[in-house]
Curated annotation (Swiss-Prot):
Record EC number: 2.7.8.7
Main subcellular location of this protein, as a coarse class: cytoplasm
Species in which this protein is naturally found: Campylobacter jejuni subsp. doylei (strain ATCC BAA-1458 / RM4099 / 269.97)
Top EC category: transferase
Family statement drawn from the similarity comment of this UniProt entry: Belongs to the P-Pant transferase superfamily. AcpS family.
GO BP terms: fatty acid biosynthetic process
Catalytic reaction list: apo-[ACP] + CoA = holo-[ACP] + adenosine 3',5'-bisphosphate + H(+)
GO MF term list: holo-[acyl-carrier-protein] synthase activity; magnesium ion binding
Location of the protein in the cell: Cytoplasm
Name of the featured protein: Holo-[acyl-carrier-protein] synthase
The protein's role, per its UniProt record: Transfers the 4'-phosphopantetheine moiety from coenzyme A to a Ser of acyl-carrier-protein.
Keywords for this protein: Cytoplasm, Fatty acid biosynthesis, Fatty acid metabolism, Lipid biosynthesis, Lipid metabolism, Magnesium, Metal-binding, Transferase
Positions that bind Mg(2+): 6, 51
Length: 115
């Protein structure tokens, strides 16, 4: 099992988004993921989730793993789900993923576990 964690100030993501708008979103979220955004806390949670997912691989966001190799969605109970691209799943021999996202006191945090 490998674990990745990321925490970010919601105000930081909110500031970047207000400055760059959709261009910022397009750099790290697919159109399907952008639909999930309800408020700045949700957006910060998505950022933290992708960062945590890349850290669980032990590489971070880089040429080995881009933001678009990581897909965040919701299940039928509205819980976050994580899916890696086929290439990442194969290269890192991933069989299971687990994602938790939380927001509190101006911060968003995400934890990812992969097997």
């Amino acid at each position: 099992m490998r674990v990745g964690c990321d925490i970010i100030a919601i105000s930081r993501i909110e500031k970047i988004h207000s400055r760059h708008g959709k261009n910022f979103l397009d750099k790290f979220l697919s159109p399907k993921e952008q639909i999930l955004i309800k408020n700045p806390a949700t957006l910060a949670g998505l950022w933290a989730a992708k960062e945590a997912a890349s850290k669980a691989l032990g590489v971070g966001i880089c040429e080995l793993c881009s933001f678009f190799d990581i897909e965040i969605s919701k299940d039928e109970r509205n819980a976050p789900k994580l899916k890696y691209s086929q290439k990442i799943t194969k290269d890192f021999n991933i069989t299971q993923t687990s994602l938790s996202i939380s927001h509190d006191n101006g911060f968003a945090i995400a934890i990812v576990a992969i097997v």
